[in-house]
Amino acid sequence: MPDLLIWGDTIRSPELRHEVPVTIPDGFLYAEAGGRRAVVIHALEIPRVRMETDLEIVAHEQLGSDELFALGIPRWQIDQELVLRGCRELGVVEAAVPASFPVGLADFLRDHGIELRVDRELFDRRRRAKNEAELAGIRRAQKACEAGLDAARELLRRAQQDGDGLDVDGEPLTSERLKRVIEDVFADHDVEAGSMIVSHGPQTAVGHDLGSGQIHVDEPVVFDLFPKDKQTGCYADMTRTYVVGEPSDEVKEWHRLVKEALDRSTAEVKPGANGRALYELVCDIFQSAGYKTQLNKEPGEVLEDGFFHGLGHGVGLEVHEGPSLGRIGHDLIPGDVITVEPGLYRAGYGGLRLEDLVLVTEAGHEVITDYPYELEP
């Protein structure tokens, strides 16, 4: 195993948060060198790191930070020098770093004789299999998803038709209002809401349209929720689609096909299953029903109808991470947490998507999501 270096903070660096499960807002160095696992860190953070991890701690003060501050040089230069001194203290002369490693810091270390090699795959693999704490955080975030959607569905059920729009308690029922209700529930569950999707009508056919405006009768409403557990920094991800009123025959067909695709692809999830093969299974279902996918379109065609996105992705310290289930697919391993999210769309009209969160286990899989799929809210 090569020596490793990661520099950043545990709020923005998933690679670092996986190794140091403590919320630290300022940049610091994590190193694996010669069998040692250590952090080079400010004294302010030492008590929590000592309490919550078994990492070796090298304090900035041990490396001469007081003398560096007395020189009056810029803080970024002090940080670079402390990282260099930390590397020398730990015996690092050559190391692998993630793609997020700061370019300026990398140049500085190389200029001082430390060889660095970016190894994206190495760091992605290290956090593929979720540890016990990360899984607990994902499950908490998923429970928050379900509670938030419960609250939103209650508003949909109470909605009254006013023309072709929907009102609740005499006020228009909008995407923004539904989001606020969900955000309140998320706050109660100690998760961060992020930029959730509550889209409706033609918006639902536009990839990652966050949604806005008044909800209308008989149109699809897509809820794609991906809150982050504050304790661990881990995400969940779930999508459901509803219609207040009477869904069209087209939407009913989409729902039947998408649910079939979800069930059949999820059934194949196990260690060694390939993400591309699962994607092809779903594309076959949709293509057999006459829909376009990325596999049967014309070369160079920009697809706006049918099934135009991947089947899923990994979820953990990032809401989108490895493995991939799409035209590029990875073999699944025990401990992967993935989404399975087939959908069908027609530009200018709408779309329908269902998404579950699935844990790959030694014996096969576990569907973490525990929520109904009906179109009626």
Q: Model-predicted segments: where are they?
A:
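Active-site neighborhoods and metal-handling regions in enzymes and metal-associated proteins
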Residues: 1-377
